[in-house]
Amino acid sequence: MMESEVDSEQSRLKREIAELRAALNRKEQCLRELEASVSSDASAEEQVVGNALESPGRAVHTKLTNDDIARYSRQLILPDFGVQGQLKLKNSSVLIVGLGGLGCPAAQYLAAAGCGRLGLIDYDEVERSNFHRQILHSESRCGMSKAESARIALLELNPHCEIHCHSRLLYSQNALHIIRGYDVVLDCSDNVPTRYLLSDACVMLRKPLVSGSALKMDGQLTVYNYGNGPCYRCIYPVPPPPEAVTNCGDGGVLGAVTGTIGAMQALEAIKVIVGLGDVLAGRLLIFDGSSGLFRNIRIRSKRPNCHVCSAQPLITELIDYEMFCGMHATDKDNPLQLLSTDERLSVKDYHAKLQAQPHLLIDVRPTAEFEICQLPEAVNVPLVEILDDSYLKRFGKQLEDKELPIILLCRRGNDSQIAVQHVRNRFPMHSVRDLIGGLHAWTNSVDPSFPIY
């Protein structure tokens, strides 16, 4: 074997070992959190997630108070809702997974409508980038647990609503225990592993799952595992590749779009609880915010050979969903690993060694993002232009110099790797690398004054 081949194989093995160690560290952290949770507040958790079977002493309301009548009068006078509908809401419990752009308006409307008990799950903390769409949080609660921040706001809105916070990640190890105590589950998450986890758990526990999503100017909504409707796996039996997944942190979203879908998730939950109207099971509502149009399309029915919800399921217990999907169960930076170490450059090395030397620095972010902030030396060529080679005429003379290093960067160091692969194939004799971690790494490691978004 050639020496260069040996070096390449060593680099590949070292990279794989590093990735496996990182995965092991995440699993060990999950185990530590679970053990700490069980040992420190097992009895409290039983009260939090206890349903009528686990907590037989929980009161069942059979009449409305004068305050209830005054507070909910505008919906009480609806002929198809009335007193019985309000009592069903008062005796109901809803679990909201994710207190972000979808979960905040959903929780707000459910609390306002008189849902008796809300469970709030979110591992994250409030930060300024949340405020344009996550309307329960405020400037004064920056750094607070999102679940706790939402609880404070909801109790100000309706002090009669019983609210329980789960400020933790939802894992295979704790999902069934938590979900068991609620009547309806709302998927307000922003990642694929959690969607599979919630769907599988709700099938196993026979809970309806109201699932919403929003990205850019568009939103979608459906109800899984209700009546004869399908589960999430019936529609998506195989997860998408990680590089094909875009969340609102990468693609952006308008706050009013998440508000629209979140409010409609609350509406579907109320319909399920009360038995009101035609629940969105077996149908997908699609909202186009740019045109203001709503479409309602029929989706496939239950898959007879579904691995989870069929008569003879192959999956009867929750699995490792991060491994199944090949991505993290969070909406935080989810770094791709498409390049070898010799094809990448740290921001510190770039700043120390290369920045003052002749080179071509290409920022592959969309133009709208480039206008927010940019490095002084960077030229903007969006990734779509890299992939269709429309940039070649623009840099014809520079690209003739095979000694000129080409550095590609983006916001987080993911799109730049895709760009490197394409440019290296086009110019195999050039030195083409990307900046690890992108502009986020630049802010964290080189220039703290550089804006981060």
From Swiss-Prot:
Residues with PTM Phosphothreonine: T62
Residues binding Zn(2+), per UniProt: C231, C234, C306, C309
EC number: 2.7.7.80, 2.8.1.11
Entry-linked SMART domains: RHOD
Residue ranges of every copy of the Rhodanese domain listed in the record: 355-451
Main location as per UniProt: cytoplasm
EC top class, as a word: transferase
SUPFAM superfamilies attached to this UniProt entry: Activating enzymes of the ubiquitin-like proteins (SSF69572)
Cofactor(s) this protein requires: Zn(2+)
Entry annotation: catalytic residues: C248, C410
Cofactor annotation comment: Binds 1 zinc ion per subunit.
Enzymatic reactions: [molybdopterin-synthase sulfur-carrier protein]-C-terminal Gly-Gly + ATP + H(+) = [molybdopterin-synthase sulfur-carrier protein]-C-terminal Gly-Gly-AMP + diphosphate; [molybdopterin-synthase sulfur-carrier protein]-C-terminal Gly-Gly-AMP + S-sulfanyl-L-cysteinyl-[cysteine desulfurase] + AH2 = [molybdopterin-synthase sulfur-carrier protein]-C-terminal-Gly-aminoethanethioate + L-cysteinyl-[cysteine desulfurase] + A + AMP + 2 H(+)
Chain sites annotated for binding ATP: G101, D122, S129, N130, F131, H132, R133, K146, D190, N191
Superkingdom of source: Eukaryota
PROSITE patterns named in the record: RHODANESE_3 (PS50206)
BP terms from Gene Ontology: Mo-molybdopterin cofactor biosynthetic process; protein urmylation; tRNA wobble position uridine thiolation
GO terms assigned for molecular function: ATP binding; metal ion binding; molybdopterin-synthase adenylyltransferase activity; molybdopterin-synthase sulfurtransferase activity; thiosulfate-cyanide sulfurtransferase activity; URM1 activating enzyme activity
GO CC annotation: cytosol
UniProt-listed InterPro entries: MOCS3/Uba4 (IPR028885), Rhodanese-like_dom (IPR001763), Rhodanese-like_dom_sf (IPR036873), ThiF/MoeB/HesA (IPR045886), ThiF_NAD_FAD-bd (IPR000594), Ubiquitin-activating_enz (IPR035985)
UniProt keywords, alphabetically: ATP-binding, Cytoplasm, Metal-binding, Molybdenum cofactor biosynthesis, Multifunctional enzyme, Nucleotide-binding, Nucleotidyltransferase, Phosphoprotein, Transferase, tRNA processing, Zinc
A Pfam family of this chain: ThiF
Pathway field: tRNA modification; 5-methoxycarbonylmethyl-2-thiouridine-tRNA biosynthesis; Cofactor biosynthesis; molybdopterin biosynthesis
Free-text function comment from the UniProt entry: Plays a central role in 2-thiolation of mcm(5)S(2)U at tRNA wobble positions of cytosolic tRNA(Lys), tRNA(Glu) and tRNA(Gln). Also essential during biosynthesis of the molybdenum cofactor. Acts by mediating the C-terminal thiocarboxylation of sulfur carriers URM1 and MOCS2A. Its N-terminus first activates URM1 and MOCS2A as acyl-adenylates (-COAMP), then the persulfide sulfur on the catalytic cysteine is transferred to URM1 and MOCS2A to form thiocarboxylation (-COSH) of their C-terminus.
Entry similarity comment: In the N-terminal section; belongs to the HesA/MoeB/ThiF family. UBA4 subfamily.
Protein name: Adenylyltransferase and sulfurtransferase MOCS3
Source organism of this protein record: Drosophila yakuba (Fruit fly)
Taxonomic path: Eukaryota, Metazoa, Ecdysozoa, Arthropoda, Hexapoda
